[in-house]
Amino acid sequence: MSEKLAARLEKLRRRHPQALADIYRGIEKEGLRVDSKGFIAQSDHPQALGSALTHPNITTDYSEALLELITPVTREVDELLTSLQEIHQFVHANLPAGESLWAGSMPSLLDGDESIRIAEYGESNLGKIKHVYRRGLAYRYGRIMQSIAGVHFNFSLGDDFWRAYQEVLAQSAPLQEFKSESYFSLIRNFRRWSWLLMYLFGASPALDRSFLNGRDHKLDQFGTDTLGLPHATSLRMSDLGYQNNAQSSLKICFNHLSTYVKTLYDATHTPFPRYEAIGLQRDGEYIQLNANLLQIENEYYNTIRPKRVTQSGEKPIQALKRRGIEYIEVRCLDLDPFSPIGVSESQIRFLDAFLLTCLLSDSAKIVDEECSIIEENFLTAVSRGRATDVELVRLLQNDYVQGGLQEWASRILEQVELCARELDAIKGGDSYAVAVRDARAKVNDPSLTPSARTYAAVSNGQSYVDWTLAMSQAHHQTLIANPLSPERMQHYVRAGEQSWADERALREADNLSFDAYLKQYLTYV
């Protein structure tokens, strides 16, 4: 595998030496607003942060308290991190007194479902759609699951790269068709190897008892209210976190764009008996958009998604079907509790090299048997990935072979290092090599992983809530102590004001009743 990857990199270097410079990235970082005691905030989305419906950089995810901070798309890692830092600085400067952003992926203190306010988006029809969709999630899965936070990493390559890579592979298909097929190749390898990201960057080995809300569990207890597993990397991505039994019946295919689109289309058009029993309205108000297996495509949970920016009135799968894949969205990353902005430069650079490795390596179609093995490997890594005896299953020369996690991780890192070297050669310096070196150190010494560091803190006297609250408040003080320049502060003030004007314009432009708008919204061309 490494030989073919190395050969492709060598051809790109020789024929198109700048092709790998054509990387584009964006980050969507979630964070729960909490009060001074560590309880989920009950306050409204702060007015100064603009309209959650229309602001380009600051919105809410599921709950009124769950902020989502969105960077512009950038070509440079430094620029990406600067944007994320600035958005955090502006947000922290405008939080209600006593509030901070929760540093952990697993939520703060909760008091049942009712303590989690569903996000509000105003009185426009689009705003109501977003709110009703979230009400539907509450009835289907409960609100507590929706209080989990993470980082989404968006990744794409420009047409200069794609033309170069198509030439290297001697492919003659239309460029967009080639891009979509190649992105699916990336996705398949990502699914095979994403357990490595959980090992390296998972940071949720423990949680507060209030998250379980009386559910059965097999977690160990530390002190009064902290629960966890000694070798877990990411309870957020385990069956305690994002779980969806109804969706387990979905066999989402990542082998071809057409079958992926069809499967999602069918799921958004197939009634599901349990959701039909919920009904669409109560007391004259909508409580879900429809009773289908998925209300809309976004309800489908996975560790990675193919994406295409939608046009006005267009649904995600319509955009994919019409114009193909534009970028991929990595969705399995925990917040880094040790970083004020939830991610680090080393992590971003590793992701660049890792995703290129997924793309440039051979990627056979995934059959049902391998799909089950992929899911089992992932669950093993999130629940006991740091155990010394943990083993995973991989496909080797048409046979499934069991082996140690660390051995397989080392083999993957050898390939990632090849891509890291090429990126360093193009960009200058050794920042990509350092990122891989950091990853290798974690593979050799599990105590260096963020999950181990978090577990050590919360299993030695401090509760999960106390430790995470202290980290959250420390990050808040760090960001407050380093305010934006007046010019950048004014930029975000104006963006907030413009978002309110945009939201008002949307509301005033509505010329349909909500019933008619919803019917139109759910109609696919």
Curated annotation (Swiss-Prot):
A GO cellular component entry from the record: cytosol
Listed EC numbers: 6.3.2.2
Name of the molecule in the record: Glutamate--cysteine ligase
Keyword field contains Nucleotide-binding: yes
S-S bonds: none
Claim: Iron is one of the keywords in the record: no
Signal sequence annotation: none
Keywords: ATP-binding, Glutathione biosynthesis, Ligase, Nucleotide-binding
Reaction catalyzed: L-cysteine + L-glutamate + ATP = gamma-L-glutamyl-L-cysteine + ADP + phosphate + H(+)
